[in-house]
Structure formats: structure tokens, C-alpha cells
């Protein structure tokens, strides 16, 4: 109703706020099959609503999920050491996989810092690049064509030949910054400036890099440089901290539980990920914003 009444209000640094008209629908059946369906939901919300998206997805529809963490399809494509691994933490009953044919999916990642202070209001703080690519990797006309369409529409988008790597690169930031901000309720600059939490951040980052490489990814990352880049972003309030403060369910499963599923299958020891997941999970559960469970061992 908010979108129908007032459209989408958008504000960005050094730009006047503007309102974008939106054709909003409460029922997907009223829209019919689309050329492109962009799924920008939090990962934990998708299983409950994915069946309702069926009217949007025709035989030629391209589905572009752009959530944080590891998506359900991440290990379903050939050519990786964990081929066929189904992430129960992300798609617990296989509902997403059944509803969205893998052949119609493009992988996607949004490199931006934004917030939604009120319904129908988006504040864009930094970044803004979108990366899309074939789940199995490699170049494709489909990815290139949609990157051009999105860019022409005002959303700078690049076609990637290794979207799984791009998603893991973003995971490096999410898995370190988000849970630490949830636990400490601090912005990223304070986390990196504090010697104790900086050490935890560094150990998490190092462990996530090693896990990604064990999973077959080529990750050329300098840990100290990545930490410095995080600090240069300034006082970022992560999405997980925003959700905690707003009383919204937090996105721990795709960001921490899914990598831990990967680690378990590879028999890769991940003590920092396990510890931070346990602490962040309990912190969120205490606030009523996450299931009261964790990873044992």
C-alpha cells in the first residue's frame, strides 16, 4: 500500500531525494510471467514465499536472486569439490530448488551499503555495483545481455565469468562484519579500530579465505589490505545490526550456517566461524530474532 500511495523514495549522498513511481502488486498472479524476476528478499524469507512466485516464472523467465551469503544453488552446479551439496540451512526442505529451475537462474551480488529507515524509503550510503553470472561459471550471452539491460536502466551491472567467486568475496565481508556488529552493536570502524575485535575479524577473514580455497575457489586476497578497506568505508552499520535494532529476523543462516555446512562436508576445522555463529545466534535468539540453535563441535 505504501508503494502504491507514494512510490519509492530514494536518497543518496550528494543527490536530492527523489520519488520513483512503482507498479506494486500484492498478488503475483495479477502480474503474469516476466522476462526477469529479481529476488531481493532476505535469504531466510525466501522458502516461505517462493511458491507464490510461480505466476511470475514462465519457461523463458530469468530468475536473479541477489541476497547475502551463499544461495541454495551454490554447490548444485558441476565443477566444484562439493558438487551436489544442498544447503539445508538455506533451503531446508528443498522448496526453493523445486520452485526455481536451476537452468533459469542467474547468480547475482549487490555491492552496496543501503538502509530502509521506513517502508518505501531507501537510503543509499555507498557502493552500488551489481555483478551477475552463470551459476556454473563461464561467459554467456544471457548474463551479458541482462547486464546491459540493467546498466541502461540506471543500475550499473557487470557480467562475471565466476559468480561463485564473487559471492564468496562478498561473504568475506558479511561473515566478518555482520555477526561482530550484531554481538557488539558497534559500527565497522569501531570493530576494526578495537584491537580485540580487530583480531577476531582478522581470524574470521583468514578462516573464511582458507575455507573458500578448500572449496575450490581462487581467492587472491591480502588480509591486511581487506581489513584496511573495511576501515576506509567508515562507520558502517551492517544490515545485521540494522535488523537487530529494527526487530527484524537476522540473516545468520546464509552468512554463517551455510559456510559451516561447507566446512563440515570438507572436514575443514572452522573454530572461529563456529564460535562467532554460536555467540551471534544466541544474541539474536535472546532478542527473539533467530532460532535458538547452533553448530555443535
Give the location of each predicted region.
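Short, small-residue-biased leader/transition segments that mark boundaries at the very start
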Residues: 2-3
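Short aromatic/hydrophobic-glycine micro-motifs
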Residues: 6-8, 155, 217, 268
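Short polybasic amphipathic segments
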Residues: 7-12, 208
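Rossmann-like NAD(P)(H) cofactor-binding subdomain of soluble oxidoreductases
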Residues: 17-117
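Internal alpha-helical scaffold of NAD(P)-dependent oxidoreductase catalytic cores
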Residues: 56, 97-170, 182-220
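C-terminal or late-domain output modules
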Residues: 177-181
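NAD(P)-dependent Rossmann-like dehydrogenase/reductase catalytic/cofactor-binding core
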Residues: 190, 198-297
Amino acid at each position: 500500500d505504501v508503494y502504491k500511495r507514494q512510490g519509492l523514495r530514494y536518497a543518496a549522498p550528494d543527490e536530492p531525494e527523489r520519488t520513483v513511481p512503482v507498479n506494486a502488486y500484492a498478488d503475483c498472479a495479477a502480474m503474469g510471467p516476466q522476462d526477469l524476476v529479481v529476488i531481493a528478499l532476505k535469504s531466510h524469507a525466501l522458502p516461505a514465499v517462493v511458491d507464490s512466485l510461480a505466476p511470475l516464472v514462465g519457461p523463458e523467465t530469468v530468475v536473479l536472486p541477489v541476497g547475502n551469503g551463499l544461495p541454495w544453488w551454490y554447490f548444485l552446479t558441476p565443477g566444484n569439490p562439493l558438487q551436489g551439496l544442498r544447503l539445508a540451512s538455506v533451503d531446508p526442505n528443498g522448496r526453493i530448488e523445486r520452485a526455481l529451475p536451476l537452468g533459469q537462474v542467474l547468480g547475482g551480488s549487490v555491492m552496496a551499503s543501503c538502509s530502509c529507515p521506513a517502508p518505501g524509503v531507501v537510503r543509499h550510503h555507498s557502493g552500488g555495483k551489481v555483478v551477475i553470472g552463470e551459476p556454473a561459471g563461464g561467459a554467456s550471452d544471457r548474463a551479458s545481455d541482462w547486464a546491459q539491460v540493467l546498466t541502461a536502466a540506471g543500475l550499473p551491472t557487470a557480467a562475471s565469468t565466476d559468480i561463485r567467486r564473487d559471492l564468496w568475496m562478498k561473504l568475506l565481508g558479511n561473515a566478518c562484519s555482520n555477526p561482530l556488529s550484531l554481538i557488539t552493536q558497534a559500527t565497522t570502524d569501531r570493530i576494526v579500530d578495537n584491537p580485540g575485535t580487530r583480531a577476531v575479524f582478522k581470524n574470521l577473514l583468514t578462516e573464511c579465505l582458507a575455507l573458500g580455497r578448500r572449496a575450490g575457489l581462487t581467492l587472491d586476497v591480502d588480509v591486511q589490505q581487506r581489513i584496511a578497506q573495511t576501515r576506509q568505508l567508515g562507520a558502517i552499520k551492517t544490515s545485521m545490526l540494522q535488523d537487530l535494532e529494527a526487530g527484524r529476523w537476522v540473516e545468520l543462516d546464509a552468512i554463517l550456517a551455510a559456510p559451516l555446512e561447507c566446512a563440515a562436508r570438507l572436514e575443514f576445522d572452522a573454530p572461529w566461524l563456529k564460535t562467532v555463529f554460536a555467540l551471534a545466534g544466541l544474541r539474536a535468539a535472546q532478542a527473539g530474532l533467530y532460532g535458538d540453535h547452533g553448530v555443535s563441535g
